[in-house]
C-alpha cells in the first residue's frame, strides 16, 4: 500500500533558470486543454494542489510539485517531483506539440535530466485525435533510454460499460485511468492504488 506522506507546491517557472534544481526524479504530466490534468494530479497526490488555468492555452508555465510516498509493502520511501505542463491544442489550428511548445517548454523537456517519466493524459471519450497522436510522436522522439512514456485515460467514468470494456481491451498496457469514482468500477479495471504503484515502478526503473 502506498501512503502519501507529503505533497506540496514548489514553484511555477517560465524560464529554465527559474526551475528548481534537478535533485530528485520527476514525472511530467501533459495533455490537451480540458483533459482533466488538475483533477488527475489532485487525485494522484491526495490533495487539492493543482488549479485549472483561467485562460487555457494562454499560460506557458511549468508548475512543480514535490511529494513523498511510502510504499509500505516494500518498505520504501521515495520523494519525487511532479511537473504539470500547460494544456496543449487549445487553438484549433494547433496540430504540432513541438511547435506549440517551442522555446522554454520544449527546452525543459529536452534537457532536464531528472525527468524519468512522461504521463500523457488522453480523454477516454475522444481517442485518436491528431494532436494527441502528434504529442505522442514528439515525446517518444526525445525519450532517452532512462525515460518512459505512458498513456493514461481520463474521464473514464463518462463512458458506458461497453465503451469502458472496449477501451480496456484495445488500449496499450499498462492500462491506466483516472475517474471520480474508482470504487464504482468493475474489479478488472485498475484501482487508484494500482495506478500509483504502476507510476512509481516506472519512475524508479532508472532513478536519478
From Swiss-Prot:
NCBIfam families: GTPase_YsxC (TIGR03598). CDD domains: YihA_EngB (cd01876). Mg(2+) binds at residues 38, 59. Its cofactor is Mg(2+). Necessary for normal cell division and for the maintenance of normal septation. InterPro entries: G_ENGB_dom, GTP-bd, GTP-bd_ribosome_bio_YsxC, P-loop_NTPase. Transmembrane segments: none annotated. It comes from Helicobacter pylori (strain HPAG1). GO terms for cellular component: cytosol. The gene is engB. Keywords: Cell cycle, Cell division, GTP-binding, Magnesium, Metal-binding, Nucleotide-binding, Septation. The keyword Cell cycle applies. This is Probable GTP-binding protein EngB. Residues 23-205 form the EngB-type G domain. HAMAP family: GTPase_EngB (MF_00321). One of its GO terms (biological process) is division septum assembly. One of its GO terms (molecular function) is GTP binding. GTP binds at residues 31-38, 57-61, 84-87, 154-157, 182-184. Belongs to the TRAFAC class TrmE-Era-EngA-EngB-Septin-like GTPase superfamily. EngB GTPase family.
Amino acid at each position: 500500500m502506498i501512503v502519501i506522506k507529503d505533497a506540496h507546491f514548489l514553484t511555477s517557472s517560465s524560464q529554465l533558470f527559474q526551475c528548481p534544481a534537478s535533485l530528485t526524479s520527476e514525472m511530467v504530466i501533459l495533455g490537451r486543454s480540458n483533459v482533466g490534468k488538475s483533477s488527475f494530479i489532485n487525485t494522484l497526490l491526495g490533495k487539492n494542489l493543482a488549479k485549472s488555468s483561467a485562460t487555457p492555452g494562454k499560460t506557458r508555465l511549468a508548475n512543480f510539485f514535490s511529494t513523498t510516498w511510502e510504499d509500505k509493502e516494500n518498505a520504501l520511501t521515495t520523494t519525487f517531483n511532479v511537473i504539470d505542463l500547460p494544456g496543449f491544442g487549445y487553438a484549433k489550428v494547433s496540430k504540432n506539440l513541438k511547435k506549440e511548445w517551442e522555446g522554454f517548454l520544449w527546452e525543459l523537456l529536452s534537457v532536464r535530466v531528472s525527468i524519468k517519466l512522461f504521463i500523457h493524459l488522453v480523454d477516454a471519450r475522444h481517442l485518436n485525435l491528431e494532436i494527441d497522436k502528434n504529442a505522442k510522436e514528439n515525446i517518444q522522439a526525445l525519450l532517452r533510454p532512462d525515460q518512459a512514456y505512458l498513456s493514461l485515460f481520463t474521464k473514464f467514468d463518462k463512458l458506458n460499460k461497453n465503451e469502458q470494456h472496449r477501451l480496456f481491451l484495445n488500449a496499450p498496457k499498462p492500462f491506466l485511468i483516472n475517474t471520480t469514482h474508482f470504487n464504482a468500477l468493475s474489479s478488472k479495471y485498475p484501482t487508484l492504488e494500482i495506478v500509483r504503484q504502476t507510476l512509481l515502478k516506472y519512475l524508479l526503473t532508472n532513478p536519478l
